[in-house]
Design a protein with these regions (language model features):
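Extracytoplasmic
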Residues: 2, 8-32
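Residue-level signature of mid-helix packing/kink "hotspots" within the transmembrane helices
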Residues: 18, 47-55, 139-140
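Conserved small/polar residues in nucleotide/adenosyl-binding loops
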Residues: 167-173
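Extracellular/periplasmic helix-loop-helix junction of adjacent transmembrane segments
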Residues: 24-51
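Conserved MFS/SLC helix-loop-helix module at the cytosolic interface between two early adjacent transmembrane helices
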Residues: 52-85
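Symmetry-related core transmembrane helices of the 12-TM Major Facilitator Superfamily/SLC fold
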Residues: 158-166
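Cytoplasmic helix-loop-helix junction between adjacent transmembrane helices
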Residues: 98-133
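Paired small-residue
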Residues: 91-99
Length: 173
């Protein structure tokens, strides 16, 4: 059971920015007054914010409760994905995308940190490989789903964030 829980955290790591990609071409139609800079900020700011929050979460995970940190990261990730379903202003979409980056930054170091904490030797190395595989498989599947959902409505690709993080938040501890 521990292995499945740890693998599931790996599924979230590749998702930041994914929901924006399939709708980039339509954003000029959805937000006709949006500048190119604002649209570029949607993809770059979350990635930029991942870095400091990854470092902060890594530091906090050494001295604090990793589980609580994971729950906070997943909650921020879930809530930002959920909020995107209702946004109709570009500045709000940028702000909430930044929150997605913050949530992901908190989660990312924990995905491998848990493997290092719970496993040793060759088994640890194998688990790190599985984690990477799950990360990439999730990215492929979520990209296909987000692309399909983008054809229905531009808000719907953000469901990818909510579905994965909601699953984690509702699992028994």
């Amino acid at each position: 059971m521990t292995v499945l829980a740890i693998w599931s955290v790996s599924a979230v790591v590749s998702l930041p920015g994914l929901a924006i990609s399939p709708i980039l071409g339509d954003l000029n139609k959805v937000f006709p007054r949006a500048t190119d800079l604002e649209i570029q900020m949607l993809t770059s700011l979350p990635s930029v914010l991942i870095i400091p929050f990854m470092l902060l979460a890594g530091r906090l995970s050494v001295t604090g409760n990793k589980f609580k940190l994971l729950v906070v990261g997943l909650a921020v990730f879930f809530l930002s994905g959920f909020a995107c379903l209702f946004i109709n202003q570009m500045w709000l979409l940028i702000l909430v995308s930044c929150l997605t980056g913050i949530g992901a930054g908190i989660i990312i170091p924990l995905s491998t940190g848990y493997i290092v904490d719970y496993f040793t030797g060759d088994y640890r190395i194998r688990q790190l490989g599985y984690s990477s595989s799950i990360n990439n498989l999730t990215l492929v599947l979520a990209t296909m789903l987000a692309s399909y959902l983008a054809n229905v409505d531009w808000h719907l690709p953000f469901l990818v964030y909510t579905s994965v993080s909601y699953t984690h938040l509702t699992l028994p501890t």
